[in-house]
Amino acid sequence: MKLFGTDGVRGKAGDFLDAITVLKLAKAAGIYFRKHSTTNKILVGKDTRRSGYMIENALVSGLTAVGYDVIQIGPMPTPAIAYLTESMRCDAGIMISASHNPFEDNGIKFFDNHGNKLNTTCEEEIENIFNDMDLMQSEQVTGRDIGSSKRIDDVIGRYIVAIKSSFPKNLTLKGLRIILDCANGAAYKVGPTILEELGADVITINNKPNGFNINENCGAMHPETVSNLVKEYRADIGLALDGDADRLVVIDEKGEIVDGDNLLGALSVYLKNENLLKGDACVATVMSNKALEDYLQKNKISLFRSNVGDKYVLEVMKEKGINFGGEQSGHIIFSDIAKTGDGLASALQVLALIIKSGKKASEILNPFSLYPQILHNMKVTEKIPLEQITGLEEVLKPIRQKGLRDLIRYSGTENKIRLLLEGKNKKDVEDAMQTLIAFFKKAL
């Protein structure tokens, strides 16, 4: 059975992610982590979905069945789990969340003892254990070897201190009015607390989770609400998080949504000017606009590209010795601060940039114009390997000769193919996209 997608295990709660499957997955993960165990503790956190209770209990049952002691810390951002796993010296951390997805979905993300997301090889090992019923049965423990579980509710303070310490000590948020959208998700407590303790005037919305309203017409996927409130309250900036707070969307004082690539560009140059950008380089994904690459090049900053997914961004960052990277979608990684995308840590760096510049958000966060880019998602019945599709290279050749950049890939979680085209001339991009769509309608 295939379990892992592009970001952990994810699916409809009670269907793909039912209690029995989760319990088996927990046992398999526990068996895997015990091979390298030092403390025999695993940390478990979750976002605010109703199904989190069911999945949490199934995880605890599976982990304790193979001898692990479990620490449950309740609703916390995904990056907090990554940080606390290492800070509390656990063998692993587990986050129950489907990020920006609706409440019906849920997911499970695993972190190693250093707070890093598991790589594909580790995930495959867990899948192999999951599918080996004899091994699963033989590793079950009895008597005094069965693990324990306890709930700790005060670890939120550790994460708050860690994130606040990433903000320059000589700066304050006093005088800044901020609209914060918590998406009725995991940051509903910690988000406002951090900004208020640093002195900001915070107007918080969507901070009343009820188990069903996470990401519902709010948060990073629906920043238009924040946009309207920024204008209404004459705020200096708007910040929209997603359900597990690993993603950030920024809205400037005019109510305009800041593009993710512009944000990466502005932050890269800021970090370089502060002598905080290792190797004068940044990592973005294959989805990022080439205008970002050209802008960074003008500022003598190298850009490396990774596959889509913040764990792949981090892999390239480690490989190249780089401490900053992110995705167009709002996952931004400051590896000196956090081991994964962290919406709140990113927000503080954006605010530091604005304060130090002495300029308004709109003047500093949009340093370049994006090249025309079209992303089209097509449903497919079968994911035929691209290299096996007859005629594809012939279709792409004239497109590339016009100087257009193409990216064609299948979705990791849905039966869809994603077609991305980008170039300096909008009409060329539009015409080429129609050609591609027509081709794939016949080919797939």
From Swiss-Prot:
Binding site for Mg(2+): S99, D242, D244, D246
Gene3D superfamilies: Alpha-D-Glucose-1,6-Bisphosphate, subunit A, domain 3 (3.40.120.10), Alpha-D-phosphohexomutase, C-terminal domain (3.30.310.50)
Highest taxon in the source lineage: Bacteria
InterPro entries: A-D-PHexomutase_a/b/a-I (IPR005844), A-D-PHexomutase_a/b/a-I/II/III (IPR016055), A-D-PHexomutase_a/b/a-II (IPR005845), A-D-PHexomutase_a/b/a-III (IPR005846), A-D-PHexomutase_C (IPR005843), A-D-PHexomutase_C_sf (IPR036900), A-D-PHexomutase_CS (IPR016066), Alpha-D-phosphohexomutase_SF (IPR005841)
Gene Ontology terms: cellular component: cytosol
EC category name: isomerase
Name this polypeptide is given: Phosphoglucosamine mutase
Gene name of the encoded protein: glmM
